[in-house]
Every structure is written in C-alpha cells, then in structure tokens.
Amino acid sequence: MGAGLVSACLPISYVLLVHLFDRNGTDRNDPESVKRRFKGALLSNFVSIVVTAFYLRDYTDSPMLEMGVRWDNIGQSITYPFILMNAFYLGQFVMMQIDRTLWHYFDWYEWKLCFNSWVWRRDIIVGPITEEIVFRACSSTLMAHVYGPTMTILLNPIPFAASHFHHIWDDQRRGYSLAHSILQRGFQFCYTYLFGAFATWLQLTTRHAIVPIIAHAFCNAQGLPLWLEIPNYPKRRDRLTLYAAYSVGFAAFVHLLYTRNGMPTP
C-alpha cells in the first residue's frame, strides 16, 4: 500500500476504531461510552504512529521529529497558539465580560466541575490530542511528502471534516430526525473543514504537534464566534464595543499568521 493511500486511511481508521469500541453505545455523552471511545482513540494513535513512522523512513531519518514530536522551541509551541487563539476569540471574551460570565474562567470550583466531567475531558483534552495526532501529526505529515504541502492543506481536512458525519447515528439514537442530523452535521463539515485546513497549515509550518492540539482545544472550548449575536444587545455602547473587539481580535489573528511573530520553527 502506497504512502498516499495510507495517509488517507489513517483518519478513517480513527473513526472506525472509536465506533468499534463503543459499538453497543446509545449515547456518545454517556461516561461509559466516552471511556470506551477513549480506548479506541488511543489504539488508533498507537497504530497510526507506528505505521506513519514506518512509511516516513523513506523520506527522513527522524520520523518522530517529522511528525512533530519534539522538544526544541517547546515554549513557543505553547505560547504561540495560545496567543493566536486568544486574539481570534477576543470578541468572545469581551462578550462574556459584558454578560458577566467571564468569571467562570477564574473560579476553582468551575474548573473542578470541568475536570470531573468525562465529556469535558473528551472535548478539551483527549479529543484534541488523539485527533490531532492521527489527522495532523500522522496523516498530514505523510501526505505532504507525497502530494506536497499545498495539496495536503486542501485535501487532508476532508476526511477530518467528513469524520463528523458519523455523529448522525448518535443523533438519531438520541431522538433527532435524519434530516435534522444531516443538516447539522453538514454545517459542522463546513467549519471543521476550515479548521482542518488551518490546523494542517500549523502542523506543516511549525512541525510541532502541540501547536494544532492547543488550537483545537481552544476552538472546542469556545465554539464558533458569536458575532451574529451582537445585534441582540440592547445597549449601543455594548454593540460598538463588541464589533470593535471582534474586529481587533481578527486583525491581530491575521497579523500573527501573516508575520509569524512568535511562531516556533523546526
């Protein structure tokens, strides 16, 4: 099997193993289902790393470094995505301050509740780590050696985004109609494709696996930008403040991407 085909199969194997380990589950948010899916994700990580390292030997003497498992510039690999995503969600944080919900981030009890939640562990810790290892560190790295970085940025996010269609079965088991599930997951496909392209670019540019992992965790925690909610704020001052915050945040985000200030380099 060629390296290009393998790079496309790795994301599929992730979804298959996650579902195989939870084949009798009825609710993906049930703690027992989450635990079983963790096992499938971890097995997929192990298999993907071994297979990718095997094929990368034809292209490099250091497969693990090529996949982004490295310690050089570790500080920048943590601070860069943290600052980058804080800029992207600046408007969101200002919105939370106006809504008086920003304090949740500084409350120990709230953090304790989060860490005790299996769903939170999946969405913020295990999900971003295991998905980025398979989709970015393994699949995109191997694909880039076969098709080049530009084609990889365009192609690699497709299986990542399409993998979310498997939630249609979860939705139906929870009582949602097929039409509702398809529409919801179709929209999810669109924005996860965009994120996948962004994360793939981060992986190939920085060669640090932790960079897209942190960006992924940040996006899972914050969700989509809520600029469409701004007109619902009754006070004109709040609306102007939010429009300004989102604009400044997006501008800073683009500036950091364009100039690559603070970005770790391999």
Curated annotation (Swiss-Prot):
The record marks H216, N220 as: Transition state stabilizer. The active site is at E131 (proton donor/acceptor), H164 (proton donor/acceptor). The keyword Membrane applies. It holds the Pfam family Rce1-like. One of its GO terms (biological process) is CAAX-box protein processing. It catalyses: Hydrolyzes the peptide bond -P2-(S-farnesyl or geranylgeranyl)C-P1'-P2'-P3'-COOH where P1' and P2' are amino acids with aliphatic sidechains and P3' is any C-terminal residue. It is an enzyme of class 3 (hydrolase). InterPro entries: Rce1 (IPR039731), Rce1/LyrA-like_dom (IPR003675). Keywords: Endoplasmic reticulum, Hydrolase, Membrane, Protease, Transmembrane, Transmembrane helix. It comes from the Eukaryota. Its EC number is 3.4.26.1. It is a multi-pass membrane protein. Protease involved in the processing of a variety of prenylated proteins containing the C-terminal CAAX motif, where C is a cysteine modified with an isoprenoid lipid, A is an aliphatic amino acid and X is any C-terminal amino acid. Proteolytically removes the C-terminal three residues of farnesylated and geranylated proteins, leaving the prenylated cysteine as the new C-terminus. This is CAAX prenyl protease 2. It comes from Caenorhabditis elegans.
